[in-house]
């Protein structure tokens, strides 16, 4: 009993066993003297104390101090960086005792505050294309977050009060703009469903960025829109970069702005922006390789199938058809990229499979067009889109076959360097596509033209540009007069000018700097250019044809270049609001046209 008590009194504490007991994983019982343990005495082994496994690191305090200093320096750098970013966006902060979180421009109605804070909700894709009331968060007045000027350094992540440079629209004006967007613009590109019960007040509370984007795209005056665009970009910058937000509201607002943006027509990219774009492209291509476009995935195909069989929204049928058309265009563009990247000494053999592939795409396009319901809403707009996609495929087939040997009527490889049947067929099919595109364009009511998205007007400009090339193509085997008899360039521009002038009389376009005015200006200048060179081009073509046929019967058309529709150089620098741009483009030598 006494031995047991002695042993218990002198048993080693946890982590203080001797080396022998530690290795044997046994309990170490110290003797009353504490110099050795009972197990080592019994086994006649040398009892040596082991080092504590819980020994505190002597440098822990010093390491903590070093870490604190590094964190402090990092916080100073973050503060300097965010201060520079805030000064860059030009926020006009007041010296009030509190600062709100970044806020969008909103309506002052029903006694609610004029600003609300964004949510930090993650990006969630709704089950359908309808924006139901169960989506998003409701913004209450008491949800505003404020910080004191004397708060800690974490407050630098909260921006200064957002003061819009333009007054907020009245409730009635906001409702009118939303109604115009819902009934006159969205039907042409129905990527979302704005039900009638979604008022401007609801969007202001639940989709503030989408509300601001709608307000921007329904501003038709160029000068007024530029102000709205700058405010919209400021909201994107502060929400996506400063607050690092990702929500469905930002996505819908961005899609709305990009779909009806007029920036590409007005030369909004300055020299610094272009240099930055080239620098980014150089870095990506040098270090990351060429970046492909977003690939079509099985999940996307399944989503499109669900929309096809679903009848939740009547406009889904139009949207599905638009997506199918764009997929065909994207697949044809992939064939062009493969043709550009081809290597070897047999370009003909490399091009033949791609030409057959483009024929397959053309057949799929015809089947898709045959499936369009005749009673489909906006069928005229959809037909113009389909004609443009076929025109795009035809021109790619012409470009791919330009350096290849021509094909005979049986599809076999021919000989010689004359413009082959394959290329002649592509060019003439393009003439037919342009004629069909124009016929569908003339059928569109003037009231619908006002709300057409950006890609519609881009297709119009590229179609007329290609018609100019086909009308003046200098090739002995190409009959320009037949093209003019089918689609007369000057008469076509006269009809389009008349159509745009009638559309400009719509009540919403009571300003002198809207997009249709600039497009009319472009067509008017091009008509003057075409009329001045019409007779000269005809005389030169007749002379060149006789001269080429008499001098060299193997003269080909490789010297007469027709660029692809997505490689028109003048489209990259277009500025319809600058007279100097017209002078630079239309004042170029005739050989560049």
From Swiss-Prot:
Gene3D superfamilies: Zn(2)-C6 fungal-type DNA-binding domain (4.10.240.10). One of its GO terms (molecular function) is DNA-binding transcription factor activity, RNA polymerase II-specific. Keywords: DNA-binding, Metal-binding, Nucleus, Transcription, Transcription regulation, Zinc. One of its GO terms (cellular component) is nucleus. GO terms for biological process: positive regulation of metabolic process. Signal peptide: none annotated. It is found in: Nucleus. Disruption phenotype: Results in the significant down-regulation of both azasperpyranone A biosynthesis clusters A and B, including the cluster-specific transcription factors ATEG_03638 and ATEG_07666. Azasperpyranones display potential anti-cancer activities. Azasperpyranones A, C, D, and F exhibit potent growth-inhibitory activity against the A549, HepG2, HCT-116, and HL-60 cell lines, with IC(50) values of 2.39-14.42 mm, respectively. Moreover, azasperpyranone D significantly inhibits HCT-116 xenograft tumor growth in BALB/c-nu mice. In addition, azasperpyranones A and C can bind with four kinds of therapeutic targets for cancer, eEF2K, FGFR, survivin, and TNF-a. Residues 18-47 bind DNA. PANTHER family: FINGER DOMAIN PROTEIN, PUTATIVE-RELATED, ZN(II)2CYS6 TRANSCRIPTION FACTOR (EUROFUNG). Transcriptional regulator that regulates both the azasperpyranone A biosynthesis clusters A and B. Specifically up-regulates the expression of the cluster A and B specific transcription factors ATEG_03638 and ATEG_07666, which in turn activate the expression of their respective clusters. This is Transcription factor ATEG_07667.
């Amino acid at each position: 009993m006494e031995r047991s008590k002695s042993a218990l009194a002198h048993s080693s504490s946890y982590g203080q066993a001797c080396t022998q007991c530690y290795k044997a994983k046994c309990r170490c019982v110290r003797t009353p003297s504490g110099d050795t343990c009972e197990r080592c005495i019994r086994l006649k082994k040398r009892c040596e104390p082991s080092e504590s496994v819980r020994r505190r690191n002597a440098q822990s305090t010093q390491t903590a101090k070093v870490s604190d200093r590094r964190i402090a320096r990092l916080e100073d750098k973050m503060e300097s960086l965010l201060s520079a970013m805030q000064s860059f966006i030009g926020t006009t902060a007041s010296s009030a005792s509190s600062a709100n979180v970044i806020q969008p421009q909103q309506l002052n109605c029903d006694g609610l505050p004029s600003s609300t804070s964004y949510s930090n909700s993650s990006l969630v894709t709704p089950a359908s294309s309808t924006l139901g009331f169960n989506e998003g968060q409701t913004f209450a007045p008491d949800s505003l977050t404020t910080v004191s000027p004397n708060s800690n350094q974490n407050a630098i992540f909260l921006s200064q009060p957002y003061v819009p440079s333009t007054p907020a629209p009245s409730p009635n004006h906001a409702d009118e703009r939303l109604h115009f967007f819902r009934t006159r613009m969205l039907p042409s590109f129905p990527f979302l469903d704005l039900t009638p019960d979604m008022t401007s007040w609801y969007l202001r509370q639940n989709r503030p960025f989408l509300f601001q984007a709608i307000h921007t795209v329904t501003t038709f005056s160029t000068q007024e829109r530029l102000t709205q665009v700058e405010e919209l970009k400021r909201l994107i910058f502060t929400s996506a970069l400063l607050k690092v937000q990702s929500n469905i509201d930002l996505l819908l607002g961005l899609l709305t702005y990009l779909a009806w943006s007029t920036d590409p027509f007005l030369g909004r990219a300055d020299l610094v922006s272009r240099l930055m774009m080239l620098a980014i492209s150089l870095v990506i291509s040098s270090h990351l390789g060429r970046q492909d476009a977003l690939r079509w995935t099985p999940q996307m195909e399944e989503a499109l199938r669900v929309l096809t069989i679903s009848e939740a929204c009547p406009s889904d049928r139009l949207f599905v058809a638009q997506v199918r058309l764009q997929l065909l265009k994207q697949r044809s563009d992939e064939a062009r990229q493969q043709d550009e990247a081809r290597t070897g000494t047999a370009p003909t053999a490399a091009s033949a499979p791609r030409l057959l592939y483009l024929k397959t795409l053309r057949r799929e396009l015809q089947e898709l067009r045959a499936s369009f319901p005749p009673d489909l809403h906006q069928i005229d707009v959809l037909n113009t889109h389909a004609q443009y996609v076929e025109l795009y495929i035809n021109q790619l087939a012409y470009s791919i076959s330009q350096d290849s040997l021509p094909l005979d009527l049986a599809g076999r490889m021919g000989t010689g360097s004359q413009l082959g049947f394959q290329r002649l067929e592509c060019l003439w099919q393009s003439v037919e596509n342009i004629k069909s595109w124009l016929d569908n364009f003339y059928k569109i009511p003037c009231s619908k033209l006002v709300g057409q998205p950006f890609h519609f007007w881009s297709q119009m400009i590229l179609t007329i540009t290609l018609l100019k090339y086909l009308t003046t193509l200098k090739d002995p085997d190409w009959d320009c007069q037949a093209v003019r008899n089918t689609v007369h360039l000057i008469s076509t521009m006269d009809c389009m000018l008349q159509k745009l002038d009638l559309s400009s009389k719509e009540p919403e376009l009571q300003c002198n700097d809207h997009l249709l005015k600039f497009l009319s200006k472009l067509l008017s200048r091009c008509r003057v250019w075409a009329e001045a060179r019409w007779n000269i081009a005809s005389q030169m073509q007749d002379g060149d044809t006789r001269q080429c046929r008499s001098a060299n019967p193997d003269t080909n058309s490789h010297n007469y270049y027709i660029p692809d529709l997505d490689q028109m150089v003048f489209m990259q620098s277009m500025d319809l609001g600058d007279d100097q741009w017209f002078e630079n483009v239309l004042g170029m030598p005739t050989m560049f046209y």
